[in-house]
Amino acid sequence: MSLPKCDPVYKATIIPRGGALGMVVSLPEMDRLNYHKDEAKQKITMTMAGKAAEIIKYGEEGVSNGPAGDIQQASALARAMVMRWGMSDKVGAVDYAEAHEGYSGNTGGFSVSAKTKEMIEEEVRELIEEGYQEARRILIEKEEQFERLAKGLLEYETLTGEEIGKVIRGEALGGDDDTPPSAIPSVPAIPRVPPAGQAPVPTA
């Protein structure tokens, strides 16, 4: 919706599953063979939305470990962009992935200098921070729509992509979705369900 380069949302649920307190499942419209830079950056934004939503709703001190999986996913994608895919102007089109194991800088005869290691980390952090700030901007800008989504998830627990569209537009749903949560691996986890009386925080 706000991130057109991301895969369409197939389903969102606040039902705990597989160690996650909820999940958003995205499915590509066709088999993906490659990533473009703008697509990868938007996926990082989508992945960081859970953490951004928690901070907006509960403040810096109210953030939980709920978005931990999202942060790991965003970090892995940002590292791939910088270290393997040549998507950093500063680092250049060099594959540093082989030297990443343990970040010792000396793996299989391939060395990475301290300066290069620091530059890689700076680029990875910059990509993640940029994604976080963009997710935060979207959530604040579209506060009304995402409050509707939060209430819809609280009421129905699981929503399909089509139902999510209806909910954020303020349209009534035809009936409950009794389909159990998909077993497909998730993209970002929805943050923890807050204490009674508070609405859950949706992701972008």
Locations of regions flagged by a protein language model:
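Soluble catalytic regions of large protease machineries
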Residues: 1-204
